[in-house]
Amino acid sequence: MSTATATSMKLTAEQESENARINAENERLRKQARAKRTISLTLSYVALALVTFLMIFPLIIVVIVSFTPNAVTQTWPPKIIPSAWTLDNYTSLFQRLPIGRELLNTIVFAGAVTIISVFFDSLAAYGLSRVDFKGRGILLAVLIATMMIPAMALLIPVYKLLGSMGLVNSYLGIIIPRMADVGGIFLLRQFFISIPKDLDNAARIDGAGEFRIFAQIILPNAVPAILTVGMFNFMGNWNDLLWPLIMTSKPETRTITAGLAMLTGHGSSVTPYGVTDEP
């Protein structure tokens, strides 16, 4: 065997040994990375599970208390699992409140406000973001400034105005003041600005008017923002208590939140957590 052949075989063996070492090192690093990912995912899932539990724990307590006699809810120390269970609270609730009617009123109120406000908010946002006119910046500043006015300061004036129009205890009375929302206008405007204006110009060249551009170009591209505004509108009005409580005093127009509020207090210093307590 020649010296060159021996040298070549030696180099080949050394190369194979080096490749094996590199492969082993890479495999070790991959296993180490997989272990780190597994630990990271496990900790993330544990943290998410803990946060989820903390978020739903109050709801669980509310459900448990609804099946607990009021006398048991006042005991100390409190118990997560009560010693007694009852359905009397639900029986009394359906006897004392027209739950079906109030639930329907809430759906009508929250749904109508959501649809109407999203429509008007998107129209206003389109004008403030895509249409050039004098005073646009001033108008936007004035709208944003109105957000600094406390809502409580407007309750009595708005109530008197609607009362003079005969809209107390009516769907229109609770819906009309919520038909537009400055926060929704601002959010949609900021999203509309991110849509390229080249789309508008191309549509105008094809003969499209402003409303067609708004309906066929802007709205389809702004679905995420519109859904976000709609979701916040619906949830906010569904959970609203003060406005429906002020504007409605009859079951025909009262929402579910206002109806449930009628069950608490009764002039007592102790809240009757079980609705079986009579006023």
Question: What is the meaning of each model-derived region?
Answer:
Residues 22, 41-279:
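A structural signal for multi-pass alpha-helical bundles of membrane permease subunits
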Residues 1-48, 272-273, 277-278:
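Transmembrane alpha-helical segments of polytopic membrane transport and secretion proteins
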